[in-house]
């Protein structure tokens, strides 16, 4: 956990906390509700110490997490349930409900479906993100100086800091996978927009390629789409020279940003 949190903070990403494996606290360690509550306090305290130690000073106070603020969720990813405190208290008065479900289920995992139906883990994660994670415009206003090595006062630097969809198009490919012999790059659009058929310079590779097949992720599927604007995640199929960690800029860029324009290797 420390390694992951430190990576996030180094890249000026706000971390949120999901306390996983609650089932083990109940079934293996046989903790009661009060002991589980104390364990939560310890985990949250240790998490906040990491923020104090590694977060930039201007973010430290606002990025610390608390159960009462719904910046912490808890549950069991294995059994598919999770909740923030407010989500839990909307349906149950105490944690004894969860403990009773596990006691009644024994080794019969199908009886745990009641928790999955009552508190779907994806709802908890989505609520935490929607309520607490910054939107792309706000995030890029302070993140870009930490993750991009180009000049901030250039046209490109200004577009990146404001997530300007009308600025030069700049992307970062965080993941590249191969499916059925075809590469699929997952990229964040930091400025500008990408339209099917646009040509890009892959900065590290020094190659130009066209994005002839783009889409957005819908769960496990990729929905083909003609264009995507800054602040979004795009899937690009078929790039031959793309690798994870590549920075991409529209090949016709002729602005005033000079020198090294690639993003730092984002963890």
Located regions from the model:
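Structural and coupling elements of P-loop NTPases
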Residues: 1-267
């Amino acid at each position: 956990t420390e390694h992951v949190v430190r990576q996030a903070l180094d890249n000026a990403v706000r971390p949120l906390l999901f306390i996983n494996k609650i089932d083990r606290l109940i079934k293996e360690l046989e903790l009661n509700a009060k002991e589980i509550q104390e364990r939560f306090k310890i985990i949250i305290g240790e998490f906040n110490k990491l923020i104090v130690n590694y977060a930039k000073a201007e973010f430290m106070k606002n990025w610390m997490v608390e159960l009462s603020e719904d910046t912490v969720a808890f549950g069991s990813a294995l059994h598919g349930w999770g909740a923030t405190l407010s989500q839990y208290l909307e349906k149950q008065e105490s944690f004894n409900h969860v403990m009773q479900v596990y006691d009644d289920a024994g080794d019969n995992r199908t009886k745990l479906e009641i928790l999955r139906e009552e508190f779907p883990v994806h709802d908890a994660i989505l609520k935490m993100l929607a309520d607490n994670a910054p939107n792309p415009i706000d995030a890029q206003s302070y993140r870009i100086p930490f993750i991009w090595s180009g000049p901030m006062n250039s046209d490109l630097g200004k577009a990146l800091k404001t997530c300007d969809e009308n600025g030069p198009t700049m992307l970062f490919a965080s993941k590249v996978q191969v499916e059925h012999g075809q590469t699929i790059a997952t990229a964040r659009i930091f400025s500008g927009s990408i339209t099917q058929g646009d040509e890009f310079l892959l900065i590290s590779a020094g190659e130009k390629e066209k994005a002839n097949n783009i889409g957005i992720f819908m769960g496990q599927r990729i929905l083909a789409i003609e264009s995507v604007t800054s602040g979004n995640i795009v899937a690009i199929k078929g790039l031959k020279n793309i690798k994870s960690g590549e920075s991409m800029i529209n090949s016709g860029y002729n602005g005033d940003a000079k020198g090294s324009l690639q993003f730092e290797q984002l963890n």
